[in-house]
Swiss-Prot record:
Source species: Mus musculus
This protein's name: P2X purinoceptor 6
Gene that this polypeptide is encoded by: P2rx6
Protein modification: N-glycosylated. N-linked glycosylation can affect trafficking to the membrane and function.
Keyword set, alphabetical order: Cell membrane, Disulfide bond, Endoplasmic reticulum, Glycoprotein, Ion channel, Ion transport, Ligand-gated ion channel, Membrane, Nucleus, Receptor, Transmembrane, Transmembrane helix, Transport
Extracellular side: 67-335
Disulfide-bond pairs as recorded: 129-179, 140-163, 146-173, 230-240, 274-283
Domain notes: An uncharged region within the N terminus of the P2RX6 subunit inhibits its assembly and exit from the endoplasmic reticulum. The P2RX6 subunit lacks nine residues in the left flipper, a flexible loop structure, which is a key element in the activation of P2RXs.
NCBIfam families recorded: P2X
Length: 389
């Protein structure tokens, strides 16, 4: 016979009693109660209807929640400008401008600059000359007003310490610079006004590597002359990416004459939204145009060595339109995992509806106490009694 300490049984009984008092050993089972409460019933059906409409109408159909998506396509952009223009200015005489002259850079990238106006300072050589009076701190009365070696943010060169005559009305500090300094006025009308009729060809290829799918915005045709005669139209020629510059600026909300005079920047956005469940038949580029800013210019120079052996340059201050091309896109295709996630989310929302209706019924309704007592019932097994003999 095995003996146990007297306190062991008492400790086990106390532990079991504690577990019972905490409800740890209680078993709960659901009890369904049919309640005739119109307010809660109507609220439940309306919420369920809202969830179903949201899941089916918005999440599944509108947002295509049944599709796996690729939001990071690989893109390639090639641009070509076509057109010629003639300018008549004293410094350059009659000059013909073609693509190599008015497009910067000439490689045809997604950011390029179209020259529409310019200011030329020809035959500059390095030496001493008076600063332009419009430059801050350039005007002077004596040599003391021109500290030697001083230069400013807007200065064309370094001061030599001399105050010299600029013209009949101004005296300015002499500088070491490319001389003569730039001093002309911007033409009142754009010198390359014909740029309005230039054409821009934009070839864009987009690749969705997740689905191994590629598409180009240019029509695949055996007719080599097609792109020489067509112009883009969203209805009749959606795959002819040839744009007239004047039309493009107008679609961006700008005026070509204003932008051509002092320059500006235009954004071109190409967006692809491809549904690959239809084999990409509706995968067409969507174009939009934005006027980003007014006023844009920069300077460039052509250098050569004169017959006298002196380095010489012609300085050009170019005004024009900067084009920025941005390509975005997304593609989707049916997949089981996103479909299951969307449907599962809807089922979770339906469960939340039941939870909210329970809160209304048990805590908010005027008969909440009655429904509480009806829904939650404590059941205990009957105690059995043994007759002692």
């Amino acid at each position: 016979m095995q003996l146990q300490p007297a306190g062991t049984g008492n400790m086990a009984s106390a532990a079991a009693a504690a577990l019972v008092s905490w409800g740890f050993l209680d078993y709960k089972t659901e009890k369904y109660v049919l309640t005739r409460n119109c307010r809660v019933g109507v609220s439940q059906r309306l919420l369920q209807l809202a969830v179903v409409v949201y899941v089916i109408g918005w999440a599944l159909l509108a947002k295509k929640g049944y599709q796996e998506r690729d939001l990071a396509p690989q893109t390639s952009v090639i641009t070509k400008l076509k057109g010629v223009s003639v300018t008549q200015v004293k410094e350059l005489e009659n000059r013909l401008w073609d693509v190599a002259d008015f497009v910067k850079p000439s490689q045809g990238e997604n950011v390029f600059f179209l020259v529409t106006n310019f200011l030329v300072t020809p035959a500059q050589v390095q030496g001493r000359c008076p600063e332009h009076p419009s430059v801050p701190l350039a005007n002077c009365w004596a040599d003391e007003d021109c500290p030697e070696g001083e230069t400013g943010t807007y200065s064309h060169g370094i001061k030599t310490g001399q105050c010299v005559v600029f013209n009949g009305t101004h005296r300015t500090c002499e500088i070491w610079s490319w001389c003569p300094v730039e001093s002309g006025a911007v033409p009142r009308k754009p010198l390359l006004a014909q740029a309005k009729n230039f054409t821009l060809f934009i070839k864009n290829t987009v690749t969705f590597s997740k689905f191994n799918f590629s598409r180009s915005n240019a029509l695949l045709t055996w007719d080599n002359t097609y792109f020489k005669h067509c112009l883009y139209d969203p209805l009749s020629s959606p795959y002819c990416p040839v744009f007239r510059i004047g039309d493009l600026v107008a679609m961006a909300g700008g005026d070509f004459e204003d932008l051509a005079l002092l320059g500006g920047a235009v954004g071109i956005s190409i967006h692809w939204d491809c549904n690959l469940d239809t084999k990409g038949s509706d995968c067409c580029p969507q174009y939009s145009f934005q006027l980003q800013q007014k006023g844009y210019n920069f300077r460039t120079a052509n250098h050569w060595w004169a017959a006298s052996g002196v380095e010489t340059r012609s300085l050009l201050k170019l005004y024009g339109i900067r084009f920025d091309i941005l390509v975005t896109g997304q593609a989707g295709k049916f997949a089981l995992i996103p479909t299951a996630i969307t449907v599962g989310t809807g089922a979770a929302w339906l469960g939340m509806v039941t939870f909210l209706c329970d809160l209304l019924l048990l805590y908010v309704d005027r008969e909440a106490g009655f429904y509480w007592r009806t829904k939650y019932e404590e059941a205990r097994a009957p105690k059995t009694t043994t007759n002692s003999s």
